[in-house]
């Protein structure tokens, strides 16, 4: 029962149960429409106003469409998409009786080609011109909204919250919209789960989220059914303003005509109907690539394949639903599954640009249901030696070239599981590997929906594949992420991307200031900017005076403040590399002109190789090395360095050692650079210059440093953090090479730079998830006096690339303080070195086995490409797992490690679930499987404690106990189950019944 005491502009309804009030609401018809229009994009609901002839709804010029998900200050989170345009006609007050004029669903498409688009609107952004970027529609009509000011209800009656809405709409018969604003950190309660969250404009600084509910949303008589040919006019009306309406209507026509797609795939179309009007359309097809999905995505995190028939897998092709009824999205999906006789639905999101063109051939329509699906993690794939495996190779459905799409999924079970919405504003500054890993971890938490993830980056999201997959890279790789990994994640579907540079942090107001004075508010700020190559500061020495390095004061700490010459390049990401490549081609550098590469890092080698590869003559390339700052070289392996330097010499590249940059253009105006002067330990020299690459020591960008310093964040050479990633501001965390541990840990030699960036990002996300995930156990902070040790991460530190001589290089090592290789090998506990091949021949393969018989370091140098992802899996494995590697090597049975690791027996080592098998086997050996029999682990402890008197060697005793007890059969069963369950990836292993 609801009661109200009406006032001219306000009412206070309450809910009662048996005469006792259990809920209360305060509603008001006075709404600050001007503020809402300034702060929120209300275009989908015609500004919450009654349509008026003088409304200004379009900008003076058409939008300029740009094929990039990284439009400046553009957001690409699906929750922030403009799904509908203004309604053509208002909904009449009698809509509850029978709606004839429900707003037509519309989409502001970003494509000019109606034949197809990218798979999801979030993958394309609109780049606005100066004149239109700030355009806001002007609404002249009267307000059509009232607002909820207060609301409360007893928890046990919370599910009945929507019952209020029938009554309050009856109090305002002339209003069609109800609004409510709540602090954005407020958890979503039952009432607003039926509302539509409105997208704020970029310049909105309100600390409130706005939700809107339409009168028509009260209709309970929504009917989902199979489409018929008679529904075509209704669907046309629904999607008439969609850019993809042609594609949807063609598929609907094809369904009505043949029930199959043009390629013969069975398909079905469904409509959602309210009051005899079509308000939603969905088209599904049978999923024909089930084997590919199972083998390339972790879909088994959500389903057991054996529980689903092949024909029960469906592919969601189109989905469009009037946002007035968005709270029925899950119901729509459930009905699609029921009526379509499906148990699973899949929705792929393809990368937006491939080779610079929109991939309309891969296009689907916008699915406004994306946030009701879960993203599925891609699986790491084995690189198979197909020719060597022959008939034992996996099927083509498994081993074919990856399609590189991000997969989203739902099933019957998931439609019944609610997602926990996290509205906290989490802002990540810097698209480094740490930042991407952090975002990846949050996005793939399937039971959480982060609605306010924002990335601020100079060039937006990485992975645009600007240089092409096969193009030589200027920069070495850390193998954390590749271009295909970004496509498989599709972070732009879930993360707002702001293109810009951080220039200030207002800790009091909790917002970040960007280079063009825009602000981005935050609740949690994550700083992952890393370090970048900086423009070197010439010492200013006059080489005509024949000065040497000894006469030059140390200028490494000086910052270059003059204009950066147009032909000077510091390469920090793929955008920088692409600009450099374009400049080379536009200025005829390939045919003529000296190129100077200045620095001591591995990137100097990869850049020289790229220059040689694109056609620059070696005699035009000058590799200038400044005096080293460490005794450890960038490669730290004499054999590899010797092979590379021989290749440089053969190519005609000139190398200068221990040279300091003295002047550009003999001290005259440096733009552009025509010459560069250097001092050396003996005689200075001068080089003509058409292009200058600088790879001097990396450092924190000055603008970033100034922003941190002005914000009074503790900075001591790097941003100071504790072991939980906290800065001195509880709301600001930082990670990566930007940071250092506080001096209280007495561990200045160890920083995040010593570890895998991907693992650092994962651990940062894990530390933050405890704030948002109610399923996690609360983390107990250790007492301050016990917080004395820094965490030690175990993931491999990797670097690789193509070096001069077209050598493919890979180095995998455990995190460590850099030490010269010769010093490492001289230590008593070094272990064993296994080397095959020769570096100069391009057949070099080195494995370091430590004193515990574990693989600790891998170095490869090859003229031929090799499966780097396979070799990374070898790190941390015991040598016996590698088919008794040490014994075979000592017996001279392994002439070539490259060939050795293409043999069929080792494919399981490269499988992504091999680690799960290891954990399962360890669990068996550490658990007590029989009451009167201790576990194998307990036996080992008893032997170590001398509680058991043995007449034989401990290893032999443990082996005998293992074979004579239940443990052997349990281990064998577990291995066979593993091979059976993963047979599609591992068909080269014999199983019972194979022969």
Region spans (language model):
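Beta1-alpha1 glycine-rich phosphate/pyrophosphate-binding loop at the start
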Residues: 416-504, 539-550, 585-586, 590-639
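Mid-to-C-terminal Rossmann-like scaffold of FAD/NAD(P)H-dependent oxidoreductases
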Residues: 738-869, 916-970
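FAD-site-proximal beta/loop scaffold in flavoenzymes
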Residues: 544-559, 563-585, 589, 683-758, ...
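Short amphipathic alpha-helix that is part of the acyltransferase structural core
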Residues: 1-3, 213-255
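Active-site rim helix/loop that mediates acceptor-substrate recognition in acyltransferases
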Residues: 1-17, 243-269, 273-275
